[in-house]
Amino acid sequence: FENKFFSDNNFLHFDWVSQNIIECQKILNNKSNHLNIFKTHSVRHKKFTNETVNAGFIYIVRDPRDIVVSFKNFSGKKFDEIINELIFQKKLMINTNGAKELLSTWDLHVQSWLNYNTVPRLIIKYEDLKLNPKEVVLNIKEFLNKIHKLKIDLSDQHIDKIIENTNFNNLSKLENQNGFDEATKYSKFFRSGKSNQWKDILSKTQVQLIENNLQTSMKYLNYI
């Protein structure tokens, strides 16, 4: 894990990185005693969030080989360009609805959150969301109860409804009907959602390049 990359100097030129982000989280948290849930695509850095404003986090990770396939359709870029960004572009930025976020490489992104161990965490693999949605929902419930002393109690009917409402096919239908802010001119946002598409799409050379460069984190997450 390249700790040197996460030094202050490497983050100073990103205008979103400042103490204002921490202060914003403090203000939002102080507005109510309820649990606030924030979504981000960013790598984790001490100037982005910390234990003074963060009770815990849920990190959703996906097989980088499938990310390449998904992002190719989403961005309109070529496979090799996306693979290069995924592996080597440490300062890769995205702009989400006007907000800049630092993605960095897949490996640095994963490690930045896995090494954030001063608050409780729940790591969820995208593939498990597809295969075992009920188990994942129960894990999320228990995690939220733990970090905020909640008393969420879900019946089987509640769980089934959650799974139905968040089912990929249902979300895709809703996007067809109502649109979705994060869709692009190249692709709808909820396009396919399948796992292991890379096996039929990426070349052997492309797969080897990804696996050779990301093998430590991929092995840790049992992707290889």
Which residue stretches match the model-derived regions?
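An amphipathic alpha-helix signature
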Residues: R65-V68, K134-K141, D156-D160, V207, ...
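Short, solvent-exposed coil/turn elements at secondary-structure transition points
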Residues: V43, D63, E127-L129, N165-F168
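Short acidic/His-enriched helical or mixed secondary-structure segments at domain edges of catalytic enzymes
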Residues: K161-Y186
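Short linear loop/turn motifs
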Residues: Q157-E164, I224
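Polar helix-capping/helix-linker motif
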Residues: Y116, S155, N167-N170
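PAPS/PAP-binding and catalytic site of the sulfotransferase fold
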Residues: F1, I123-L150, I162, N170
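Acidic/polar loop patches that form or flank catalytic/metal-binding clefts of enzymes
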Residues: K149-Q157
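PAPS-dependent sulfotransferase catalytic domain
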Residues: F1-I124, T184, F189-I224
